[in-house]
Regions:
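Short, surface-exposed alpha-helical segments at coil->helix boundaries
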Residues: 65, 69, 73-81, 226, ...
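Small/aliphatic-rich secondary-structure junction motif
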Residues: 1-62, 161-222, 239-245, 251, ...
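Glycine-rich, Arg-bearing micro-motifs that act as flexible, cationic patches
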Residues: 102, 119-141, 160, 270, ...
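Short, structured interface segments
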Residues: 135-156
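Structural beta-alpha unit
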Residues: 1, 78-120, 238-277
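Solvent-exposed polar/charged
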Residues: 27, 113, 144-145, 270, ...
Length: 310
């Protein structure tokens, strides 16, 4: 079965890292096809308006558009060669370019949805102190606004092909497992790790309730979480079995932490040598807590990929 990934690129180092990651995924994903997608630079609104009134301005506009398209095709040709050298068949790598229309993220999402892609892969920009709130706006907008298609966010050089699914018992986490099972189906060698962090009271509320009240609430949270995961794990394992995976390919880990849930997930991924973290974008009942965890992981990700499933 074909698995279609849209790799959104420009000429930046993060885009080159995203392309390299797509090449490595060819060894993990059976039936992988990649479309390299580049949005051309926007053209001045002044020139667009002038072109409606002046033939000379229209001629200049046509020249700029032609140069943009030519530069885009050259960029994509180089990335295509990278993927072919990585082992993808020529017919499995398609370049595509479009003029800038509504905005980078919106244009990428529209193309991905119209093309029925299984995932959008993008490199994450480095985050400076000033950029912290924006997280490299294109990747941030893709993550927040993709209604259906999972977004794969790559940071740095990802060498490992090991996959860890960070799960919290939510429907979003089950959709993430379903996505992971589909993308990796047909590979008898792949190994998964289900990783669950038992949440603490502080993960839901920063108010200090005192030792007695806080202890009772901690117990209630732990008991509720255990009941939830007792239902979740059989459902998740069933999805993997339906996709053809054997039980010996699957490992399950549960951890408690004094850190935040997001930091614990990242630490477990680093210590376990996992190259990809798979998780749902929202937690139980689309809670802020679940969204806060995925937000934290996406911001602090380093030399790894995050498969974030709506």
């Amino acid at each position: 079965m074909q698995k279609k990934i849209l790799v959104a690129v420009d000429g930046s180092p993060p885009s080159r890292q995203a392309v390299d990651y797509a090449g490595r995924m060819n060894n993990l994903i059976q039936g992988l096809t990649v479309t390299l997608f580049h949005i051309q630079p926007p053209i001045s609104q002044f020139l667009l308006d002038e072109a409606k009134r002046s033939g000379r301005a229209q001629a200049e506009l046509n020249k700029i558009a032609a140069r943009n398209a030519e530069a885009s095709r050259g960029l994509l040709a180089g990335y295509r060669e990278t993927l072919i050298r990585a082992g993808l068949a020529e017919q499995s790598v398609e370049p595509a370019t479009r003029p800038h229309n509504q905005g980078l993220a919106k244009d990428i999402l529209d193309y991905a949805q119209n093309g029925l892609f299984d995932a959008i892969l993008v490199g994450r920009r480095g985050i400076s102190a000033v950029q912290q709130m924006f997280m490299g706006s294109v990747s941030a907008h893709l993550i927040e606004n993709s209604p259906v298609i999972p977004v794969w966010l790559v940071d740095g050089n990802v060498r490992s092909t090991r996959v860890m699914a960070a799960v919290d018992g939510s429907e979003s986490a089950l959709r993430a497992v379903d996505h992971m099972a589909f993308m990796l189906s047909g590979n008898p060698e792949v190994r998964f790790c289900f990783f669950h962090v038992t949440p603490r009271l502080k993960d839901y509320c920063e108010i200090n309730f005192g030792a007695e009240a806080g202890g009772g609430l901690e117990t209630l949270i732990a008991q509720g979480d255990q009941r939830c995961m007792d239902d979740f794990f059989p459902a998740a394992l069933a999805k993997l079995r339906e996709a053809g995976f054997r039980e010996e390919q699957i490992e399950t880990r549960t951890d408690t932490t004094l850190l935040s849930v997001g930091e614990t997930i990242l630490e477990a991924a680093r210590e376990g040598g996992f190259g990809a973290i798979v998780m749902g974008r929202r937690g139980m009942n689309k809670s802020f807590f679940g969204g806060k965890v995925s937000y934290s992981v996406s911001h602090k990700l380093s030399d790894a990929a995050l498969w974030l499933v709506p």
